[in-house]
Regions:
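Loop-to-helix transition at the N-terminal end of transmembrane alpha-helices
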Residues: 30-49
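Juxtamembrane transmembrane-helix boundary signature
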Residues: 45-65, 96
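Cysteine-centered motifs
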Residues: 422-424
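Helix-loop-helix junctions within the multi-pass membrane cores of secondary transporters/permeases
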Residues: 1-22, 43, 64-125, 252-347
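Helix-loop-helix hairpins and the membrane-proximal interhelical loops
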Residues: 1-35, 149, 181-267
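Polybasic, lysine-rich low-complexity intrinsically disordered segments
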Residues: 418-420, 445-446
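Membrane-embedded alpha-helical modules
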Residues: 79-192, 196, 309-411
Length: 453
C-alpha cells in the first residue's frame, strides 16, 4: 500500500503543472479561468478514479497538452468558433470514442495513418506548443517584414527565459515534478519583478470556484458542417493515439503487459478515457486523456488502481488551492510549454529520412503546424502530401483506402489548397480506381503507436 500511495503522489507531482497551464491556455478563448481550473481538477480526478476502478491500472488522466492548444488556437482563434461550440465538439468526440471503443473499431483508425506521419504529428504538436509558450511570453512577436522576430526584453519575457532555463536544469538533474517546481519558482521570482500580481489580502486556500460559467455550456448549432466533421475526426484521432500510445509505452516491460504484448484491461482503460472526455467537456475543459507522466508513478512501483486513486485524491485536494494556481502568470508556464515541446520531439529520430516519400510529408506536417498556427491544417497538408507523393511515385499500394477517404474529399481539399494558391484534382478520383483493382492483394500493415502529447 505504501509503495502504491507514494507512486500516486509521484504521478501527481509530475503532472500538477496542468492545473496552472490549462486555465492559462483555455482562458485565452474567453473562458472563465477560475471555472476552467475547477473543471480541470474535477475532470482529472473523476477520469483518474474511472481508470482506477474500471481498469485497475496505475494511470492518471487530465486535459491533454496539445489538444488544449488545438482547442484554443485552432478551433476558437483560428477557425472562429465560439468556445461553447468547441466544447460541444469535444463532447461529441467523447461519445464517438465511446462507440469506437465499445465496438473495437479503434484498431482500424490506428491502422489508417502511416507510421512516419504519426511521428511527425507528435513532433509537430510539440513544436506548436513551444511556439505558443514563446509567443505568449513576448519572446517571439509579429513583424510586418519578417512575419516573426525576437521581442523586447520586457520583465515578462525575461521571466519566461528564466523559466525555460530553470525547468531545463531541474529536468537535467532528474528532479521529480520538475515542470511543477519550475512554474512555482518562476511565479515567486515574478513577484518582485511585477509580473506575478499578488492581490491585497491574498489567501492561498479557498472553497472551490463555481463551475457555472462553463458547466454544460454547449453550442451544437455550428457542428453540422464538413469542416467541423473533420475537426471532430481530428480530435478523435489525437485522443485515440495519445491514449493507446501512452498505455502501451508506460506499461512496457512490466507485468501489466500480457504474453502477446498487449496491455491488460486496455479496453476498460480506453472506455474510462472516452467517458472522461465527455465528462470533462460537460464540466468545461478540453479533451481529457491518459498522461504519459503516469510512467513516473509506474517507475516508483505503482501497479494497481490504488496508485490512480491516490493521484485522483490529490486532484480533489487541489480544488481548495485554486488561488495559488490561478496566481501563476502565463510567463511562468512558458518553461513547461517549451519542455513539453522538447519531450515530444523525441519522435523525430524515428522518422525515416532516407525515403523522401516518407520524409517530405512528415516535414510538411511539422512545419505547417507551426507556420499556419493550426494543428488541423498541418495534419491535413501532411496527409494530402503523403497520398500525392505515394500515388505519383508509383507506391500507391502503401496508401490505405481509409486514409484516402478520410483525408481528401473534394470539398476539404479545395478549401485547404485554396489557402496556399493551388488547384488539384481530387486524389480520391485518381486513387480509388487503382486501389479497387489491387485492394484484395494489398492488406494494410498494423503499425506501432506513438504518443501524441
Amino acid at each position: 500500500v505504501k509503495v502504491e500511495t507514494m507512486a500516486g503522489i509521484t504521478t501527481f507531482m509530475t503532472m500538477a503543472y496542468i492545473l496552472a497551464v490549462n486555465p492559462s491556455i483555455l482562458g485565452q478563448t474567453g473562458m472563465d479561468q477560475r471555472a476552467v481550473f475547477t473543471a480541470t481538477a474535477l475532470a482529472s480526478a473523476i477520469s483518474t478514479i474511472l481508470i482506477a476502478f474500471l481498469a485497475k491500472l496505475p494511470f492518471a488522466q487530465a486535459p491533454s497538452m496539445g489538444i488544449n492548444a488545438f482547442f484554443a488556437f485552432t478551433l476558437v482563434k483560428g477557425m472562429g468558433y465560439s468556445w461553447e461550440t468547441a466544447l460541444a465538439a469535444v463532447f461529441v468526440e467523447g461519445i464517438i470514442f465511446i462507440i469506437l471503443t465499445a465496438f473495437n473499431i479503434r484498431e482500424q483508425i490506428v491502422k489508417c495513418i502511416p507510421l512516419n506521419l504519426r511521428y511527425a504529428i507528435s513532433s509537430g504538436i510539440g513544436m506548436f506548443i513551444a511556439f505558443i509558450g514563446l509567443k505568449n511570453a513576448g519572446i517571439i512577436v509579429s513583424n510586418e517584414a519578417t512575419f516573426v522576430t525576437l521581442g523586447q526584453f520586457t520583465p515578462t519575457a525575461i521571466l519566461a527565459c528564466i523559466g525555460i532555463v530553470v525547468s531545463g536544469v531541474l529536468i537535467a538533474l532528474k528532479v521529480r515534478g520538475a515542470l511543477f517546481y519550475g512554474i512555482l519558482i518562476c511565479t515567486l521570482i515574478g513577484i518582485p519583478m511585477g509580473v506575478t500580481q499578488l492581490p491585497d489580502g491574498f489567501i492561498p486556500v479557498s472553497m472551490p470556484k463555481s463551475l457555472d460559467p462553463t458547466f454544460l455550456k454547449f453550442d451544437f448549432s455550428s457542428l453540422l458542417n464538413m469542416d467541423m466533421a473533420l475537426t471532430i475526426f481530428a480530435l478523435v484521432f489525437m485522443d485515440i493515439f495519445n491514449t493507446v500510445g501512452t498505455l502501451i509505452g508506460a506499461a512496457a516491460k512490466t507485468e501489466m503487459m500480457d504474453e502477446k504484448g498487449n496491455v491488460r484491461h486496455i479496453k476498460q482503460a480506453m472506455m474510462a478515457d472516452a467517458l472522461a472526455t465527455s465528462v470533462g467537456a460537460a464540466l468545461g475543459t478540453s479533451t481529457v486523456t491518459t498522461f504519459v507522466e503516469s510512467a513516473s508513478g509506474i517507475a516508483e512501483g505503482g501497479r494497481t488502481g490504488l496508485t490512480s486513486f491516490t493521484t485522483a485524491a490529490l486532484f480533489i485536494l487541489a480544488l481548495f488551492f485554486a488561488p495559488l494556481f490561478l496566481l501563476v502568470p502565463s510567463a511562468a508556464t512558458t518553461g513547461a510549454l517549451v519542455m513539453v515541446g522538447v519531450f515530444m520531439l523525441d519522435a523525430v529520430p524515428k522518422i525515416d529520412l532516407t525515403d523522401v516519400s516518407e520524409a517530405l510529408p512528415a516535414f510538411i506536417t511539422m512545419i505547417t503546424m507551426v507556420l499556419t498556427y493550426n494543428i488541423a491544417e498541418g495534419m491535413a497538408l501532411g496527409m494530402i502530401c503523403y497520398t500525392l507523393v505515394k500515388l505519383l511515385s508509383g507506391q500507391w499500394r502503401q496508401i490505405s483506402l481509409t486514409l484516402a477517404i478520410v483525408t481528401v474529399k473534394k470539398e476539404e481539399e479545395a478549401s485547404l489548397l485554396k489557402k496556399i494558391g493551388c488547384k488539384c484534382l481530387s486524389v480520391v478520383e485518381l486513387y480509388l480506381p487503382l486501389q479497387s483493382r489491387v485492394w484484395r492483394g494489398a492488406p494494410e500493415k498494423t503499425l506501432p503507436l506513438v504518443h501524441l502529447g
